[in-house]
Curated annotation (Swiss-Prot):
Top-rank taxon: Bacteria
Gene name per UniProt: rsmG
Biological role: Specifically methylates the N7 position of guanine in position 527 of 16S rRNA.
Binding-site list for S-adenosyl-L-methionine: 79, 84, 130-131, 145
The keyword Methyltransferase appears for this protein: yes
Protein name stated in the entry: Ribosomal RNA small subunit methyltransferase G
InterPro entries, A to Z: rRNA_ssu_MeTfrase_G (IPR003682), SAM-dependent_MTases_sf (IPR029063)
Organism: Alteromonas mediterranea (strain DSM 17117 / CIP 110805 / LMG 28347 / Deep ecotype)
Predominant cellular place of this UniProt entry's protein: cytoplasm
Keyword hit for Cytoplasm: yes
Top class in the EC scheme: transferase
Length: 211
């Protein structure tokens, strides 16, 4: 079995466990994204995960676990790294618009190449520090995964949404200490415990809004 076939098998089994349906084209885009990440990773050190099969679990399936919970049409993924979770979510939601923000040029170059190679029309990679970035219009969702504490995320990103916008943070263990540190200007509107196929460890989603 080729690595491409192995990745496809892991993906299909993961999608089934997550009760998600993606087209053959979307599945192929996700496999190709992992293969591209693995290729670039050897030279540019985009992620500490070295095994492409582990990338499929720890990066792709972990990102796709958000799919049932993602609302809004105009989404920014801050501190996205090589495009996580924004790139897999953009593949899953071709009708939504995604801005993928990172301050490191090598990551943004990789994302730009990925967008071109995968034929994605709904992704805009941007190189910038989050506090220096301003969208043309307020975003519906500010999304983060392994980016910063909730307090820092809200401080740096509050200008990216209006009163209706939401902040959505993907965390490991339930971040009780971080929640207690959140400014009085924001409130936690919802939390969700996620199960990611083949991934050991806790995963939680935290929604926050301006008061």
């Amino acid at each position: 079995m080729t690595i491409q076939q192995e990745l496809h098998t892991i993906l299909v089994q993961g999608l089934d466990a997550l009760s998600l349906e993606l087209s053959e084209r979307q599945q192929q885009q996700l496999v190709d994204y992992v293969l591209l990440m693995d290729k670039w990773n050897k030279a540019y050190n985009l992620t500490s995960v070295r095994d492409p099969k582990q990338m499929m679990v720890k990066h792709i399936l972990d990102s796709l676990a958000i799919v049932p919970h993602l609302e809004g049409d105009n989404i920014i993924d801050v501190g996205t790294g090589p495009g996580l979770p924004g790139m897999p979510l953009a593949i899953a939601f071709p009708e939504k618009r995604f801005t993928l923000l990172d301050s490191l040029g090598k990551r943004v170059r990789f994302m730009t190449q990925s967008v071109h190679t995968l034929g994605l029309k709904n992704v805009t990679p941007v190189q910038s520090r989050v506090e220096a970035h301003n969208g043309e219009v307020p975003y519906d969702i500010v999304l983060s995964r392994a980016f910063a504490s909730l307090k820092d995320m809200l401080h740096w990103c509050q200008h990216l949404v209006d009163s209706e916008g939401q902040f959505l943070a993907l965390k490991g263990q339930f971040p009780q200490d971080e929640i207690e540190e959140v400014s009085d200007h924001f409130h936690v509107s919802k939390t969700e415990n996620l199960t990611v196929p083949n991934l050991v460890g806790e995963r939680h989603l935290v929604w926050l809004k301006k008061k």
